[in-house]
Structure formats: structure tokens, C-alpha cells
């Protein structure tokens, strides 16, 4: 199992797990430490248990072993934020056009979804950049054909939710929150989920869908109960204050 230990340590640290947590009841902490340093071997069945303990699929692990590099889709996501937050519509248009060319060349559906995501960001900056109903339907189909949502899908939803109908926001929000395997033990993913649900909550309040709003408020209270993140808790207080304002102004 050459290099397996080193790769396992990479994923363990990436996902924020201690040696003790990763070892669990599958192996001793010292055995796992030696395995990561390449000093001993472990059985295949034990190895699969360890991967499960740190929430890493065999497919992702194998990809990493094959000199896994950051994918073009990761590069795409990384380039979006600085252009969006600087209101650089020209930069976003360039990214969208590049993704469209890749779609036309390869036929890969995700490139088409990427162009819609960028169009959604452009729409947030300038409402003259319209996202068509057909494009939104493509996104809906894509999401509910995916058996497992990862950070890409949550980011996609977070960038387009303002265009969704309220019933659909509630639906995808429930789907996200019920897929606890995605965010329960991984801090980065949990932050994405909290951010998305804060936006869903605010959007439901804005549109006077109080039953849906109450659902997201209840879930967020549980998610943030033991959280030390100041920004998320401050945002929660802001939306909570907005709810009080709406109630008192009626």
C-alpha cells in the first residue's frame, strides 16, 4: 500500500480529523500513525473503514493517488469570487464565455451549468443580465439527478437561489439539510450549508413565507448552537432582527 498512508494523512488533515478520531475502533492510534508514515501495512478492510471514518470516498482517494491536481472546475470556482466581489462584470463575462466554449467543444454538461452560474452572478450585479427559465430548468434537473451533493452543488445553489421560486428554495434547503453526511463532520462544508440557509431564511422572510422561514430558523439554531463563528452568529442576529421588524410593522 505504498503512498497510501501519506495520502490518507493528507485527507485526514484536510478534513480536520485527529489521529484518534480517524482511528476510532478500527485501529490503534499508534498503528495509524505508523501507517501514515509508511512504517507498517494494514488490511484492505481496515483501510476502507478508515476512509469511512474521515468521510472520504474510495473514488476520491484513488484520484488523489493518480497525481490528483485541482480540477478545472475548482479553478472555475476560485476565479468567480474575486470578480464577483469587485463587481467585475467584464471578468465574469470572460469566464462565462470560456465555459461556453468548453461546453461546445466537449459537450460536458457541467460547463453549461457553469455558464448559468456565472449568469446568475451577473444578474445579482445587474438585473439586465437575465437567466432564462430554460436555463433554470437545466439547473433543477442537474441537481436532482445528482445522488450526492458536494461543495460545487451547494455553491451553485448559493449563487442562484435568488432566482428560484420560494417553494423550490424550501425544497433544496431541505435536501441540503437532510444530507448530513456532507456537512456534519467537515467544517468547510458546514460553513457553506450555514451560509446558504441564512440566505434561504432571509429570502423566505422577504417573500412573507413565514412557515418556510421558521423551518430554516429552527435548523440554523441547531447548527449554530455550539458554533464559535462570529460572522455566522452575527448574520443570524441580523436576520432575526429583520424578522422582528417585519412582525412589528404589520
What are these language model-derived features?
Residues 7, 78, 114-125, 155-159, ...:
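"A position-specific structural signal for the A-helix of alpha-solenoid helical repeats
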Residues 16-33:
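Short alpha-helical DNA-recognition segment
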Residues 45-60:
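DNA major-groove recognition helix of helix-turn-helix/homeodomain DNA-binding modules
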Residues 73, 109-116, 148-155, 187-198, ...:
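Start-of-helix signal in alpha-solenoid helical-repeat scaffolds, especially tetratricopeptide repeats
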Residues 85-98, 127-137, 166-178, 207-218, ...:
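Helix-turn-helix repeat elements of alpha-solenoid scaffolds
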Residues 97-104, 138-145, 177-184, 215-226:
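Amphipathic alpha-helical segments of tetratricopeptide repeats
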